[in-house]
Structure formats: C-alpha cells, structure tokens
Amino acid sequence: MTNYPYKTREGGATVTVFVPYDCGNHCPFCINKQEYENPVGFSLEKICESIRTMDEITPKCDFVFTGGEPFADLDALQTMLDQIPTTHRVFINTTLPTLQGATEDDLVAFTEKNKDKITCINCSRHVVKYVAECSDDIFSRIAVPVRVNCVLYKDYPKENLKPYLDRFKPYGVSVQFRFDYTDTTPENLYEEESDKILHDLKDLFHYTGMDGCRM
C-alpha cells in the first residue's frame, strides 16, 4: 500500500455536518445512531450558524453532510447547502433510500439544481442489504459524480464480491470497500497480515489506486 500514500486536503479542515434529522434505518455498523437519541440543541438553525462560522474561519474547507440521512428532508438540506459559498467542496453521504414524500425524480432534480455546489455523492450500497434502497438506475441519472461505499461487515459472503462490482459496471461509478469502523482500533488499523478484507480483495481484484469522490 506504500505505493499509494494517503493524501490530505489542501485548503483547510474537513467539516462534517450531521443533519438534524434521523434516517430511520438501523444498520448494525452505524457509529452515528446514538447521536440522534438525544437531539436537544440539535437544530437546523444552529447548524446553519455553524456552517457560516466555519466558512469565515476556513473559506476553502470541505463540507461533508452525513447523518442520519441527508436526503430525508430535501428542504432542510437545501437550506444548509444555501449557506455554503462555491469556494468549498461539498460531499453528501447517503444510502439514496426510498423516501416518504419524495420520488427518485425528486432526488435527481435536487442534484440537477445543485450540480454546481455538490462535488460528489457517497452512496452506501452493501453486499448484504440493510435498508430499502431506490433503484440502481438512479446512478445514471444523478447530475453529480457518485461513489459507492460498501462496508464489509463481519461474515460477509466473499463469493458475492465480484457480482457486487459487476452490478455497478453499467453506471461507471467508483466503488470503495471499507472495514467496519465500530471494530477499528489503533492496534488493527494498519495490520495487514490478519486482515481478511484486504486478503479477499487482493485475491479477487487488482488495486490500481484511488479515484472517485475523495474528501
């Protein structure tokens, strides 16, 4: 992995924005769920105020919207995006779920409206499904770049990894596999010898470097 050194963002810190509404999902590896159990003081107005403050401090930082599910409230997400000048890069972490009160056409229209502001959408699509997802066809319609993120959780089926990648070939999106953050420790973070995921990926695929949505 030394041939592909990790690179940090030039221009300031990365600001992570936890949207002030829950996703309604229960993914077993989610590290944010407990943040939504006590939403006291967690409001759209305060988040917008914080966004403006960070813009004053570091006018070229990256903003990453996560949650929760940012697309669960398109009006609120639009309000937050409207606070961010175009000097910043903006990333959105999402499952692109099926939503009450919003259609796939609504999601596509939202990306079209904000295509000059949204740098990339990081969409979770897992080998084992945990949420009700909208169709993969939306990847060919979204007006901004998309990267698919896949958490390889516990005893994932290795034999499904290649069919999983083949699933996204028609859409030309990048796919990132990652470890379960809830199981990550300082001791195992850089450990390669007993890393099952790393060995499975090396066995099935050829790593050529990082591309796609990089924060």
Place the predicted regions along the sequence by residue:
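Acidic (Asp/Glu)-rich catalytic clusters
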Residues: M54-E56, P85, V108-D116, S135-A143, ...
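Core AdoMet radical
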Residues: N32-F42, T58-D73, T86-A102, K115-C134, ...
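Short, well-ordered amphipathic alpha-helices
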Residues: E49-I51, D106-L107
